[in-house]
Amino acid sequence: LHLLSRRQRQMCIRDRLSAIAVDKGVQPVIVCTKADLGEVEFLRSAYERSTLPFIAIRYDSGEGLDEVRQWISGRLCAFCGNSGVGKSTLLNTLLPQAERETSAISQKLGRGRHTTREVTIFEAFGGRIADTPGFASLEANRAGFIPKENLEHAFPEFGPYLGQCQFTGCSHRSEKGCAVRAALAEGRLSQTRYDSYCAMYEEVKDVKDWQRPKV
């Protein structure tokens, strides 16, 4: 769940979370809870090319809420995102008896105050919802570590182009004959998603085997 202002920081956190989920075999669903801020179509376009489900919420009309309920049904779901993006507001709308505290966004910092301080699990719609505390940042080499050789697989839209690069072990950043970069240049991949991939790769590229977190 992500607030759609402060675009660059939010995009990195969103893409890191989704990449970690994909790497761990968990289905991420992108839910925009501030759909009235005018950037929904920008994100919708990026995620249509990513193959990840995208839901825009409009509280005035109820748009998107049924889709969220359907994803919860029969599953254990976690509401994740940085502070102030609307996790508690969405939970209160879906499940009024949850009575989660909410807060406004700081205009100076561009993020909200932590109102959820522990993980709480709620039974709802034939499934379960885990409401998690927010956070201010997410480092790729610490939170849900993904080795550099696996990172390309955490971005599903890269899939059709993997194995087509000129060089084995291509990092898809600067090499000649890179099929991923060619797809990006042709508009078949989202520039913002690609930028997130590069930022994550930069953080983990020099991590040695002995430095990697133990699974």
Annotate each PLM feature.
Residues 6, 19-28, 35, 50-53, ...:
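Helix-rich effector regions associated with P-loop NTPase G domains
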Residues 80-81, 86, 114, 118-119:
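Polybasic, low-complexity association/targeting segments
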Residues 1-9, 13:
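Single conserved hydrophobic/aromatic residue that forms the stacking wall/gate
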Residues 16, 22-24, 40-42:
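Phosphate/Mg2+-binding loops and adjacent switch elements
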Residues 36-85:
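Canonical P-loop GTPase G-domain recognition
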